[in-house]
């Protein structure tokens, strides 16, 4: 019998407990940056996943079912639903090892995070935006021009791909990372 040429390729599996804890903590923390707070239900579901009682897919199914069974009418509850769904999606993305550093991946991640929450999830906006950020004490963030977003994305990704971190001191790496402009581009905001 001939050797299976695909045997060396292993199907990605659930990460270990520590990595799951990191993924959920990061996901919830990223929501807090936008002033969103997850529900107790999400926290309990995340703990079940971290402890290995349910898979990441099962956690997402539980979160989705939870909101299908109890339609939301209040704006605070809508934001909690967003926090829960996006947190579970961030945790899933952080648990995956597959990744391509490209504009298409960036847009795809946006679509995965906000699908079913914002109608323009994963689409490059065709209008200019501004937003006052509480993390900047109310200062307005300057976002890229809608007419140039695709070109700006491609340029920024190429610049980052060409940058070498080899041999740099940690503070220089942090300084460079602080100048990466992807958040300024902001694919879509509803």
Predicted regions, residues:
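FIC/Doc superfamily catalytic core
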Residues: 1-189
């Amino acid at each position: 019998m001939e050797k299976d040429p695909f045997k060396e390729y292993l199907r990605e599996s659930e990460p270990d407990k520590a990595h799951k804890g990191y993924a959920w903590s990061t996901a919830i923390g990223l929501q807090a940056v936008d002033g969103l707070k997850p529900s107790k239900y999400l926290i309990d579901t995340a703990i079940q996943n971290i402890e290995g009682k349910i898979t990441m897919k099962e956690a997402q199914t539980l979160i989705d079912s939870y909101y299908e069974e109890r339609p939301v009418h209040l704006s605070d509850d809508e934001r909690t639903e967003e926090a829960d769904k996006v947190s579970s999606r961030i945790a899933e993305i952080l648990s995956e090892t597959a990744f391509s550093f490209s504009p298409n991946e960036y847009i795809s991640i946006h679509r995965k995070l906000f699908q079913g929450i914002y109608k323009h999830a994963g689409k490059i906006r065709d209008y200019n935006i501004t937003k006052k950020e509480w993390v900047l004490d109310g200062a307005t963030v300057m976002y890229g021009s809608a007419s140039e977003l695709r070109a700006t994305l491609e340029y920024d990704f190429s610049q980052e791909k060409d940058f070498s971190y080899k041999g740099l001191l940690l503070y220089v790496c942090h300084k460079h990372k602080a100048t990466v402009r992807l958040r300024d581009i902001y694919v879509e905001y509803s």
